[in-house]
Amino acid sequence: CAAKASPINLTGSEVQGLIDGADYYAKAVIPAGTYTGQKKDATTFGVKATVVTSNMVESDLVYLVVKAVFENFDDFRKQHPAFSSLKKEDMIADGLSAPLHEGAVRYYKEVGLM
């Protein structure tokens, strides 16, 4: 990113209170080098990312999208520094903002994640 920004550390009891109060918040680290001139990691918090769809989307399509991401997980994690610490097991249960789609559940069960 070419932006001239300096991420700041956001920690402390107020931040921990936010994290404890909502499953969709988590501690996060912005890796050094994410922004031009950023020499150190920045410890902060953020919203957990979730891919959300409608239950009106065909189950087979959702199944194929989830399968493509999970079967190419190492490449997926390289697409953005924020993805680098993702773990498959956490992605299907930790801080979900919507129920899992039946197509996703089918894939997770097929590969033994559920």
Residue ranges and their predicted role:
Residues 42-114:
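Segments of small-molecule ligand-sensing domains
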Residues 1-51, 56-57:
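Pocket-lining segment of extracytoplasmic ligand-binding domains
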